[in-house]
Swiss-Prot record:
It comes from the Bacteria. Binds directly to 23S ribosomal RNA and is necessary for the in vitro assembly process of the 50S ribosomal subunit. It is not involved in the protein synthesizing functions of that subunit. Keywords: Ribonucleoprotein, Ribosomal protein, RNA-binding, rRNA-binding. GO terms for cellular component: ribonucleoprotein complex; ribosome. This is Large ribosomal subunit protein bL20. One of its GO terms (biological process) is ribosomal large subunit assembly. InterPro entries: Ribosomal_bL20, RIBOSOMAL_L20_CS, Ribosomal_protein_bL20_C. Disulfide bonds: none annotated. Transmembrane segments: none annotated. Belongs to the bacterial ribosomal protein bL20 family. PANTHER family: 39S RIBOSOMAL PROTEIN L20.
Length: 127
């Protein structure tokens, strides 16, 4: 007698159909299409978990640049001055400050603008 593995097949198919349960049309009802849908969704999720980091960094930089232009400064100049002053506040925190507490953000900008950066060691000359 041939054993076709009916229970295992049903369990496996139900697993794929359950994962595709939020999909529209035949995507949540047909086993073959549901499986393809779930696999493609996993690919998109994998890709976008990485893109999310890029997107948020771009958003923070965009917000900072907008807030800094109101102060008469650009993002690139500001970041350069922060590094010269050895101020280590990341872009996420600066962006949040610019939105939620503009007065404190303005203090940081004024401090960076007014003070001269700490002099780095001069480069050794050839002789």
């Amino acid at each position: 007698m041939r054993i076709k593995g009916g229970k295992q097949t049903r369990v496996r198919r139900k697993k794929w159909l359950k994962q595709a349960s939020g999909s529209f049309g035949t995507r949540h009802a047909s086993y073959k299409v549901a499986k393809q849908t779930v696999i493609q969704a996993a690919k998109y999720a994998y890709r976008d978990r990485r893109n999310k980091k890029r997107d948020f960094r771009s958003l923070w930089i965009l917000r900072l640049n907008a807030a800094l232009r109101e102060q008469g400064m650009t993002y690139s100049v500001f970041i350069n001055l922060l590094k010269k002053h050895n101020i280590e506040i990341n872009r996420k925190v600066l962006s949040e400050l610019a939105i939620k507490e503009p007065s404190k953000f303005n203090l940081i900008v004024q401090k960076v603008k007014s003070e001269q950066p700490k002099a780095a060691k001069p480069a050794a000359l050839g002789n």
